[in-house]
């Protein structure tokens, strides 16, 4: 972290933070707390993946399943109904449902080859959505006037970067996101369960 004390952190007029850690550790939990303060812009990499990059794929998957049901098939073909994704920061089920689980189709699984194909698509989408952090860091200040920016990264960030490569495209993009203006201080926080407990007890960043 670039801050050597809580006082240094609090004195920063504009903060840019990237949270990273395994899925379920509390990145979105913390981001939601900050967003509700109305001073932080919350950028969710997973939400971006499930909307811009894989949104159409997700809906097409739902439609393909619906076409197996005669009643739904009839209504889809004559445009009587439509199917869409209701993905949100808090509900990423459409994305996880699309990725699926390899296994017996009769038990809700998908063929392993199809699973790998979807994982490859997600990998590419995750790279694109993470690189987009810089774009939204600009938007947060330039369009919406937010003082602070928090990037809620995906749980598999470590799988799309090479920390030993100084020219890694994703890491360079993240670095740029936090060096756009000299006004901004930045840091990256690795979350562990203790951090989430700290916030749940009513403490503030």
Question: In which residue ranges do the predicted regions lie?
Answer:
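Pre-Walker A adenine-sensing motif
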Residues: 1-11
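Hydrophobic anchor at the beta1->P-loop junction of P-loop NTPases
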Residues: 19
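The conserved Walker
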Residues: 23
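Conserved glycine(s) of the Walker
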Residues: 26
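Hydrophobic positions on the alpha1 helix immediately C-terminal to the Walker A/P-loop
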Residues: 30, 34
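Short beta-strand-centered segment that lines the nucleotide-binding/catalytic pocket of NTP-utilizing
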Residues: 39-54
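ATP-dependent small-molecule kinase phosphotransfer cores
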Residues: 54-164
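ATP-dependent NMP and nucleoside kinases share a basic, alpha-helical "lid"
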Residues: 134-143, 152-204
């Amino acid at each position: 972290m670039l801050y050597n004390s809580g006082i240094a952190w609090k004195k920063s007029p504009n903060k840019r933070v990237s949270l990273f850690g395994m899925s379920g550790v509390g990145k979105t939990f913390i981001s939601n707390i900050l967003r509700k303060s109305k001073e932080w812009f919350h950028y969710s990499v997973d939400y971006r993946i499930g909307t811009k990059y894989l949104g159409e794929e997700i809906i097409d998957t739902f439609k393909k399943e619906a076409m197996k049901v005669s009643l739904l098939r009839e209504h889809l073909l004559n445009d009587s109904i439509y199917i869409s994704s209701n993905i949100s920061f808090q509900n990423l089920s459409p994305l996880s449902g699309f990725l699926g689980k390899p296994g017996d189709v009769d038990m809700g699984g998908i063929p392993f080859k199809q699973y790998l194909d979807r994982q490859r698509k997600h990998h590419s989408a995750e790279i694109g959505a993470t690189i987009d952090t810089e774009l939204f860091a600009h938007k947060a200040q330039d369009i919406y006037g937010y003082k602070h920016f928090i990037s809620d990264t995906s749980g598999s960030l470590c799988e799309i970067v090479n920390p030993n490569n100084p020219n890694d495209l994703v890491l360079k993009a993240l670095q740029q996101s936090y060096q756009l203006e000299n006004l901004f201080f930045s840091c990256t926080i690795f979350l562990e369960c203790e951090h989430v407990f700290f916030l749940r007890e009513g403490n503030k960043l």
